């Protein structure tokens, strides 16, 4: 089963979609600057030397600037105390130039990440992790939505159309970052939603019933071809680095080369990943508009 079995039309090109979204955001930021004399500002806080986090923060910084959004990068040493980090968040909460605050996870082990996230002003919580935003999302109220699930939903609607009502969606993974908010978004679209995770006894059978299959477990190639219903739309959120024949490559949670019978699938890399940063900047633009009571369009 070679990769040639997956027709080009079945590949969901997240890179292309994200580029279009970024073009739209850039144009809106320019218009806002002309009308208000101000631009949205995003503060990103990185604690310690985690190499993957440094790469992510660098990429976010570049793309933020490219969209015309002000980027404030705070790189703190690994030994930063809880009090020091909370004090920085408190300063950013009241800084009028900062409309969105993102704390890059994971934090060093001695820091309480949940306490840090809850310290962020919910109106500046562009990652959508604050309990206020999570609660609003769960009860169907306007909220900042975590960037990865939001990106997944945009890709689904681009492929399936705006109306997802009645489709059976299976979400594999129950993290607060992807799985749980994804379930809430799909419920809001009137999908029938099943959530499965590492303790689920019959995960393959459940997945085989899915019209929409979203996989976010961090286990390379866990979902095999026979887990996928013919014609299903598969969104692979996994980003796993694997070593093979002395080389390192990035793969998803789905055995991509076995998914030729899927109706559509996101590749890894180039699927969900680019959407996450685009949605972060979209949330930052929304935060600016809400804080200044200006129309986003």
Swiss-Prot record:
Signal peptide: none annotated. Its EC number is 1.5.1.5, 3.5.4.9. Keywords: Amino-acid biosynthesis, Histidine biosynthesis, Hydrolase, Methionine biosynthesis, Multifunctional enzyme, NADP, One-carbon metabolism, Oxidoreductase, Purine biosynthesis. The keyword Oxidoreductase applies. It comes from the Bacteria. CDD domains: NAD_bind_m-THF_DH_Cyclohyd. One of its GO terms (biological process) is L-histidine biosynthetic process. GO terms for cellular component: cytosol. It catalyses: (6R)-5,10-methylene-5,6,7,8-tetrahydrofolate + NADP(+) = (6R)-5,10-methenyltetrahydrofolate + NADPH; (6R)-5,10-methenyltetrahydrofolate + H2O = (6R)-10-formyltetrahydrofolate + H(+). The keyword Hydrolase applies. Catalyzes the oxidation of 5,10-methylenetetrahydrofolate to 5,10-methenyltetrahydrofolate and then the hydrolysis of 5,10-methenyltetrahydrofolate to 10-formyltetrahydrofolate. This is Bifunctional protein FolD 2. It comes from Sinorhizobium medicae (strain WSM419).
